[in-house]
């Protein structure tokens, strides 16, 4: 327990965790995280090896470090059931942090430009997510997005090269109007591709 996140929160407070990069986040236009875990008091966990949760107050770790938004479309957003997911959304809302993912898209106004973001959880369905990619990008366009960023939770852990599903969905996203594709889940860096003039970062690591 002494080396756990909980112990460090109790000992050092919410400001401890991003202290070395907070100044960077404060200077940028938009800071987005992929949040793998839940902010909930639920106790019935999913049947899986790793399940993550924390109290709602832990949202202050993000809000106090200039994090504006969180992608929740990943394999840990429902670790303690459906309510843990909605609890997380509520906790982030209360902390002033926008969230998006699955069928929930978000528009931010950054220096007068409407930036649209969406999160796609690819791991279970692979190419079946294509229709959601199209639908979400269409929704962002309809909402007036001038720049569209698509976050994919995809790929294989500890693999340094993207697989064919990643490549196909990334290309589809850009063909449909995305300006930037960002990937996560492998926990390691994967390649960056320039496709039709737009960048695809297949995995940002951790």
Question: What is the predicted function of each stretch?
Answer:
Residues 1-206:
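Acidic, metal/ion-coordinating pockets
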